[in-house]
Design a protein with these regions (language model features):
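N-terminal catalytic or cofactor-binding beta/alpha core of small enzyme domains
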Residues: 1-123, 132-145, 151, 156-179
Length: 179
């Protein structure tokens, strides 16, 4: 019998001019499944909320979802050590002594449905990625981490289908081969 993977799926609530966040809608629309922990976090630069979510969930795999203003779905390849609350502000480092970039560790293959991005921006999506990946790295945790940006105006049913498909693939991942 196959072991059920512990998967943390997180997204975000409303922010700035957006009263709704497509990631919250997607997460709420997904049926419960064994091993899946679904979390919707507030959009804020608060390291503790991300670290605490990781520690409480004890996942084997983390899949983060972020809303974007891009034209298509993007799988993020790395997080950058930079953040800023407003586009006019100069960027600040997330971790003064941390690496400039940290690569994601979950190989997400979604075909032509999504592009590959090496720039997660410098807002809370990137912040969450960097904080979680840095925590995983510094504590030598055996957790695979991936992140997907979804356009705010993307069709919810289509996006939910994509996330459902990815979660199914996550259940079938050979964790030893991925690490």
């Amino acid at each position: 019998m196959k072991k059920t993977r512990r998967i943390l799926l997180y997204g975000f609530g409303p922010y700035r001019q957006f009263r709704d966040n497509i990631t919250a809608k997607i997460i709420k629309s997904l049926a419960p499944r064994p091993g899946l922990k679904k979390v919707i976090l507030p959009v804020r630069f608060h390291r503790g909320q991300f670290v605490n979510t990781l520690e409480r969930s004890k996942p084997e795999i983390v899949l983060g979802l972020g809303q974007s203003s891009r034209r298509g779905v993007d799988v993020e390849a790395q997080a950058a050590n930079r953040r800023r609350a407003h586009p006019a502000d100069p960027p600040k480092r997330i971790s003064p002594r941390g690496p400039a970039r940290i690569k994601t560790t979950l190989a997400l293959k979604v075909g032509r449905v999504a592009g590959k991005s090496r720039n997660a921006g410098d807002y809370v999506c990137n912040f969450s990625m960097y904080v979680m990946l840095d925590h995983i790295r510094r504590h030598d945790l055996r957790i695979l981490y991936g992140f997907i940006h979804i356009p705010y105006d993307y069709e919810k049913k289509k996006a939910s289908g994509l996330v459902t498909k990815i979660l199914g693939r996550c259940q079938r991942i050979n964790l030893k081969a991925q690490r």
